[in-house]
């Protein structure tokens, strides 16, 4: 499949740095703002800490490293495909090729790509981050997130994914004036199972995003109202 591309972001890119474990992006106005992943990770920090305690530090590190490698490889292959570039499968593990093969019918529902692995920011929200994809999915413009997981997770566990996608939708609108219709998460497992989560209740997730931001700001500045 050949994907059509349209670029409304120009050559936008931002410098970034790490400070006290928080990734910061330098906006065009000179402000340094946190990444959306720093905010969502902070909001879910206790869940992650409880999991590490339950399975043990060594096992948690092993699982995290394995998941990170799997996700990075799958994203790299998907990005090449979406950019209409040839994938040299000798550069990837067999598992990546297997997972990509099962995800491909769902990837082929994407077209008219606005962004693939692009940095977005919002001065209004004071955040920035890197979106997997903004494109039409089954004919409707969407923020599209590619996720790998050992098994398909229940939707109730994925709130932070949808909140992060909502930020990208908000930032893209702020930067371009273009509104996305929906939030799409394509999740694929090492066993080849694929699940697509399609969220359209954007108002709910913008409210959650504000809550995430306020808690993050309160923790890092001591401000009661997150301002």
Question: What residues fall within each predicted segment?
Answer:
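Metal-dependent nuclease catalytic cores that hydrolyze phosphodiester bonds in DNA/RNA
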Residues: 1-128, 227
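Mg2+/Mn2+-dependent nuclease catalytic core
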Residues: 115-222
């Amino acid at each position: 499949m050949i994907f059509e591309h349209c670029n409304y972001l120009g050559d936008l890119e931002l410098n970034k740095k790490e400070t006290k474990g928080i990734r910061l992006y330098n906006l065009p106005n000179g402000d340094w703002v946190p990444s959306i992943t720093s905010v969502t990770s902070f909001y879910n920090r206790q869940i992650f800490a409880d999991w590490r305690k339950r399975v043990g530090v060594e096992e948690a590190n092993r699982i995290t490293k394995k998941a990170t490698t799997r996700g990075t490889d799958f994203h790299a292959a998907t990005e090449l495909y979406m950019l209409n570039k040839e994938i040299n499968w000798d550069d990837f593990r067999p598992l990546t090729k297997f997972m990509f093969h099962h995800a491909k019918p769902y990837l082929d529902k994407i077209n008219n790509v606005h962004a693939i692995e692009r940095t977005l920011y919002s001065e209004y929200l004071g955040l920035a981050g890197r979106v997997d994809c903004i494109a039409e999915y089954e004919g409707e413009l969407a923020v599209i997130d590619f996720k790998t997981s050992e098994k398909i997770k229940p939707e109730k566990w994925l709130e932070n994914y949808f909140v992060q996608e909502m930020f990208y939708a908000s930032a893209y609108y702020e930067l371009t004036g273009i509104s996305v219709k929906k939030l799409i998460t394509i999740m694929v497992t090492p066993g080849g199972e694929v699940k697509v989560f399609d969220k359209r209740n954007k108002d709910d997730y913008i409210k959650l995003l504000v809550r995430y931001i306020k808690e993050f700001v309160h923790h890092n500045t001591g401000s009661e109202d997150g301002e």
